[in-house]
Amino acid sequence: MPKKRLIGEVLSDKMDKTVVVAVSTLVKHPRVGKYIKRTKKYYAHDENNECRVGDIVEIVESRPLSKLKRWKVERIVERSVFAEKAPEEDLEGGSNNDN
């Protein structure tokens, strides 16, 4: 049986080798017939910590890796605009006031 594949957006990359991916699907309401957007979060394994918040990624089903992780990041479909630019911070820690 082939493994399931989903495409979603990275919501969080704060954990080591783990990302939270939001996958949106459209489901039809049984009585009304209207399509409703449903979003589900998946914890996915990111071996090299390559994913950043806002990236569009493809995740694939895998064996259980922890209590919550059952998916692996297969590839990064599209990089986020914000992920490409790393913020340059003042490493000296001083303020700009020279009194």
UniProtKB/Swiss-Prot annotation:
Gene3D superfamilies in UniProt: Nucleic acid-binding proteins (2.40.50.140)
GO BP terms, alphabetized: translation
CDD domains in alphabetical order: Ribosomal_uS17
GO MF assignments: rRNA binding; structural constituent of ribosome
GO cellular component: cytosolic small ribosomal subunit
InterPro entries xrefs: NA-bd_OB-fold, Ribosomal_uS17, Ribosomal_uS17_bact/chlr, Ribosomal_uS17_CS
UniProt KW keywords: Ribonucleoprotein, Ribosomal protein, RNA-binding, rRNA-binding
Ribonucleoprotein is among the record's keywords: yes
Signal peptide positions (record): none
Transmembrane stretches, start-end: none
Presence of keyword RNA-binding: yes
Entry-linked HAMAP family: Ribosomal_uS17_B
Subunit structure of this chain's protein: Part of the 30S ribosomal subunit.
Function: One of the primary rRNA binding proteins, it binds specifically to the 5'-end of 16S ribosomal RNA.
Record-stated family: Belongs to the universal ribosomal protein uS17 family.
Name under which the protein is recorded: Small ribosomal subunit protein uS17
Organism from which the protein derives: Thermosipho melanesiensis (strain DSM 12029 / CIP 104789 / BI429)
Taxon lineage: Bacteria, Thermotogati, Thermotogota, Thermotogae, Thermotogales
Gene: rpsQ
